[in-house]
Amino acid sequence: MIAENLKQVLSELPAKVRLVAVSKFHPNEAIEEAYRAGQRVFGESKVQEMTAKYESLPKDIEWHFIGHLQTNKIKYVVPYVALIHGIDSYKLLAEVNKQAAKAEKTVNCLLQLHIAREETKFGFSFDECREMLAAGEWRELKHIRICGLMGMATNTDNDEQIKTEFCSLSSFFNEVKAKWFADAESFRELSMGMSHDYHEAIAAGSTLIRVGSKIFGERNY
C-alpha cells in the first residue's frame, strides 16, 4: 500500500520537485517499505525518534528535520541531518553553526517564514528575515549553509488563501535570492506544501514537498 501511495505522489511531481516523505510517528517497517520502493528522503520532527531511526535504518537515507528545533537538542541531530527545514531565529542558526563546528561539518538549513494566518506556526516575518540577512552576521557562520526558505500555509479549505500565501513566499524567495544569495548556487530550495496542499505549492514554485499521511496513512500517536 505504501509503495503504491508513494508511486502515485511521485507521478504527480515535476522534475524539479523533490519529495520529503514525512515518517514521524510511523514505525521503521513503514519507512523500510517506502525505502524498498525507492524513497531516500525522509522527514522527522522529534529529535529522539529521528536519532533512533537513524541508528537502525539504512545509512543512505537522507534525513530532514522538519519540526520546531530547540537549541538544546541541536547537538543530537547535527551529526547526521541532511537539511534542517525550520530555522526561525538567528540564535538557532548560530547554535547549529556552533554544534556543526564541533562535529567538523557544514549543515544545510532553510529559513522558516511565517506566512499563515495562525499564531501556532513558527517562523520569521518577512521584515525580521530581511533585518537578519541585512545585518550580515550570518556570513561569519562557516559551518552552516543557507539553502533556501520554508513555510507552512494556513490549515484551511480556502484554496485562494493557500495560493496567496505560497505565492507571497515564492516572491520573497526571489527577493532574498537576488539581494543576498545571487551568487550562491546552493540557495535554491523552497520547501512548501504538505499532503493537503502540495499541488498549490508546486504551482507557486515549491522545490521540496513534505508529504506524510498521503503516503503512510494516518499517524500512530
Task: Please provide the spans of the model-predicted regions.
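Short C-terminal tail/terminal secondary-structure segment
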Residues: 211-221
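Divalent-metal-activated hydrolytic enzyme cores
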Residues: 207-208
